[in-house]
UniProtKB/Swiss-Prot annotation:
Its biological purpose: Associates with the EF-Tu.GDP complex and induces the exchange of GDP to GTP. It remains bound to the aminoacyl-tRNA.EF-Tu.GTP complex up to the GTP hydrolysis stage on the ribosome.
Locations listed in the record: Cytoplasm
A Pfam family: EF_TS
Organism: Xylella fastidiosa (strain 9a5c)
Predominant cellular place of this UniProt entry's protein: cytoplasm
Involved in Mg(2+) ion dislocation from EF-Tu: region residues: 79-82
Gene from which this protein is expressed: tsf
PROSITE patterns cross-referenced by the UniProt entry: EF_TS_1, EF_TS_2
Family under the similarity heading: Belongs to the EF-Ts family.
GO cellular component: a single term: cytoplasm
Cited NCBIfam families: tsf
Protein name: Elongation factor Ts
Single GO MF annotation: translation elongation factor activity
Length: 292
């Protein structure tokens, strides 16, 4: 497969590695981007694939919370310009409120829910599109209904979190929600980390070791690898991370000191996993006034 400049550019954006190293990684892996990322990780040139954290689409995250009930909704627009439009914002808030009241559990069920205007969510979406001249999509919905402490947190309309905590108090739950928003842990506790993830990380750590280290006795080698994996597990679990409101303690220590337990959490960030053609602000304005 031909290694094109666009492939090299994409790999560089995902990893932050130099162009020559990216070209070599692609050549070694027949132009396969994902395989090239892993090859670079095994070579010790990059710690992680940055693509997963790149936000591509626009829109808004809306959170609505009432006691033990809370919903988290992502509404997408094509541009940031429209994401700040009053019609778009009113629609997003109305959809989230309706989702909470109706008990909707997914986007498909939400489409037929009626808003205070008498329109269904889908009908209102079509009306908003007609007003603003841009596609609008209700992309994701998450909810919690529980007798436990439930907290909701939204940051700048772009990141939203729901957290369920058994025991403790609402303030603890809110602090945990803020932590999840800031640190984005993939897993809750050690028990939640997948065997596939652990095996892959073990393979990567082994690949990065020197031949001298690899030649050590099996029990010593296992201790070295286990130490590295344990460190990684702390980084990717909520319980293992230093608490953002008190970095001297881990989240697990803070939660246990309160006699509590984090049952689970939901986190959304605008545009996760969606690619977007980059346009400058002037282009967005021109598009809105019909001059492009």
């Amino acid at each position: 497969m031909e290694i094109t400049a666009s492939l090299v550019k994409e790999l560089r954006e995902r990893t932050g590695v130099g162009m020559m190293e990216c070209k070599k990684a692609l050549s070694e892996n027949a132009g396969n981007i994902d395989a090239a990322v892993e090859w670079l990780r095994k070579s010790g040139l990059v710690k992680a694939d940055k693509k997963a954290g790149r936000i591509a689409a626009e829109g808004r995250i809306v959170v609505v919370h009432d006691g033990g009930k809370a919903v988290l909704v992502e509404i997408n627009s094509e541009t940031d310009f429209v994401a700040k439009d009053s019609h778009f914002l009113a629609f997003a808030e109305a959809v989230a409120q309706a989702a909470l009241v109706a008990g909707a559990v997914d986007v498909e069920a939400l489409k037929s829910v009626k808003l205070p205007s008498g329109e269904t969510v889908e009908e209102a979406r079509a009306a908003v599109i007609a007003k603003i001249g841009e596609n609008v999509r209700v992309r994701r919905l998450a909810r919690i209904d529980s007798a436990n402490n439930v907290a909701a947190y939204v940051h700048g309309g772009r990141i939203g979190v729901l957290v369920e905590v058994k025991g403790g108090d609402v303030e603890l739950a809110r602090g945990i929600a803020m932590h999840v928003a800031a640190m984005n842990p993939p897993y809750n506790k050690v028990a939640d980390v997948s065997a596939e993830f652990l095996e892959k990380e073990k393979e990567i750590e082994l690949s990065k070791m020197s031949e001298k280290d690899k030649s050590k006795p099996a029990d010593i080698l296992e201790k070295i690898i286990s130490g590295k994996i344990n460190k990684i597990v702390k980084e990717v679990t909520l319980y293992g991370q230093p608490y953002v409101l008190n970095a001297d303690q881990s989240v697990e220590q803070v939660v246990k000191a309160a006699g509590a337990d984090v049952i689970g959490f939901q986190r959304m960030e605008v545009g996760e996993g969606i690619e977007k053609i980059v346009e400058d602000y002037a282009s967005e304005v021109m598009k809105q006034v019909g001059l492009s």
